[in-house]
Amino acid sequence: MIRNRLLAILIAVGGTVGGTAAVSTASASAAGLTGAGSTLVAPLMTNWINGFEIKEGIPVKYSAVGSGEGIKAISKGTVDFGASDAPMTPEQEAACSGCVTIPWALSATGLGFNVPGLKKINLSGPVIAGIYFGKITNWNDPKIAKLNPKAKLPNLAITPIYRSDGSGDTYAFTNYLSKISPAWKSEVGYATTVGFKAGVGAKGNAGVTSTVAKTQGAIGYISASYLIAAGSLGVAAVENKAGNFEFPNLKNIEEAASTVKSLPASNTVSITNPPKKATGAYPISTFTYAIVPHTAAQKGFLQQFLNYAITKGQVYGAALDFAPLPKVVVSAAKSAIASL
């Protein structure tokens, strides 16, 4: 039942949530709010919108177009809020002058794969980098076999799948690889869009999930909530700094965020590859953010919606693999919302 509901949500967020028009629609009137951006947060956004409309009677429409497009939309003033899983770059900050970044959800980027007969596998950062560099090309590669001594690994070519659109999942994934692999950091780097050395591009989380599902031997980085819905895919346990292989589940995501003791003025913080003391942390965990103008035209409605998302709206997260925000993050978010 839960999986069917999630699949329905993911079909909806392939385009829009709440019946929204295209991103070019003018900013919301007094009738409600419009937003655009992250596909990672979109399943949770569906529940936020439904709950908020019931509680406050204020409609919210959201376009799940990817973090990069969401930042463009809020910078142009065509929506009331953007949503991104990546901090804005200096260039984006200049284009979105006066915009405020507010952390409002916590999840992870998982690795889903399609290998017949295999549902779980251990992968390390260097091996993942090797796959996306195009240097590890078969599932029976000795480097994969060493991490999975009991697994029956087939002679099957690996097809890495990546996001073709500007994506916060790409940011989290490549940020993690840049911390693990000096070669990745120098040759590819991390951003919402990078020049991958191997693989096939697909648009959105739904596109990556679909491409992996229909391609034997494929592997792709996918938001954790989409991995829940795509029950047919195998899921990788990724090695963390403590040397443990962990899955992108609530407990492990929450442990990754437990290392955050304060937030900088930007309200953004990376929790990929967290310190060794977080022994059970999933190492590609990430915060996701609302991006709003400091002088919002819909200030009152926007503050209500944002406060709802970071407090009462958090209860919807568990079923979708979103962990609750740490208290220190909620406090920083409330201060940022009050400053609008």
Describe the residue ranges of each PLM region.
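Short, low-complexity disordered leader/linker segments with a strong preference
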Residues: 1-32
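Flexible loop/hinge segments at secondary-structure junctions
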Residues: 22, 27-340
